[in-house]
Swiss-Prot record:
More about this protein: There are three forms of the large subunit which have the same sequence but differ in charge. There are four forms of the small subunit which have the same sequence but differ in charge.
Coiled coil segments of this chain: none
Function summary: Involved in cell wall degradation. Degrades polysaccharides containing beta-(1-->4)-linked galactans, acting as an exo-(1-->4)-beta-D-galactanase.
Name of protein: Beta-galactosidase
Principal EC category: hydrolase
EC code(s) of this entry: 3.2.1.23
Reactions this protein catalyses: Hydrolysis of terminal non-reducing beta-D-galactose residues in beta-D-galactosides
Subunit details: Heterodimer of a large and a small subunit.
Keywords: Glycoprotein, Glycosidase, Hydrolase
Family: Belongs to the glycosyl hydrolase 35 family.
Keyword Hydrolase: yes
MF terms in GO: beta-galactosidase activity; hydrolase activity, acting on glycosyl bonds
PTM comment text: The small subunit is N-glycosylated.
Length: 38
């Protein structure tokens, strides 16, 4: 058991897992992308 990594993914307990993450910078994004109608 353990966590290691190779050139493509994390390897958790022998199974490859790919983590995908991101963020949005609201001041740089068009307001229509995140506008909420009330």
């Amino acid at each position: 058991t353990g966590v290691t990594y190779d050139h493509r993914a994390l390897v958790i307990d022998g199974x490859x897992x790919v983590l995908v993450s991101g963020s949005i910078h609201y001041p740089r994004a068009a307001s229509s992308w995140y506008a909420v109608e009330t």
